[in-house]
């Protein structure tokens, strides 16, 4: 593996030599848009682990805590805008070099930047899904419903946490009211893949189909500590196609990389703009 210096002719050369890149992005791609990431440069958790799927579905107090924090966090998360890293990757697609972008992020900022071929591996936070009937509601609409039911919480503020969460510590969530599905009364959950929940098989299969056509893989802003993303790097390595990564700190795939650039995503990709 080659470690590139801060000025990145090796990365520019890598991208220039390939016509059908499969791009995988993670939280580091969106930190400059004001969305915190989960892990430090060693791949360790910066905070307690995110909410678990089984706990969310089985425990009312877990749902109260999640949605109370989300009520506060969504106000800024929902206003996040693409940064230069998103725009650079959209330019890569416009240049005809990115066949598919697979993102582990749930912020839809790649789409906002104009990227067309995007797979949201872990879903999208701008939708809320009923776990009973499957009905989907725009998150902004559900935000209004949460606010109407919990007006006293609207005056609170807290530091941002990853994926629209807020560090609302030491609060009593027992009085927080979580609306049920208007159609069937079912449990409402953000349309994202929680920890302990499986990525839909059709999403995984579609991503693998596109990876099978790629002539190289580019990882941007991910430590790959979560297997749902790491497995695609394993598949690329099995095909023996070149793999480059832009990430601050270690990744789970360091021994599989052809090239690694330890630099902020927007800086490393600036030559594309």
Residues covered by each model-derived region:
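Conserved catalytic core of sirtuin-type NAD+-dependent deacylases
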Residues: 1-273
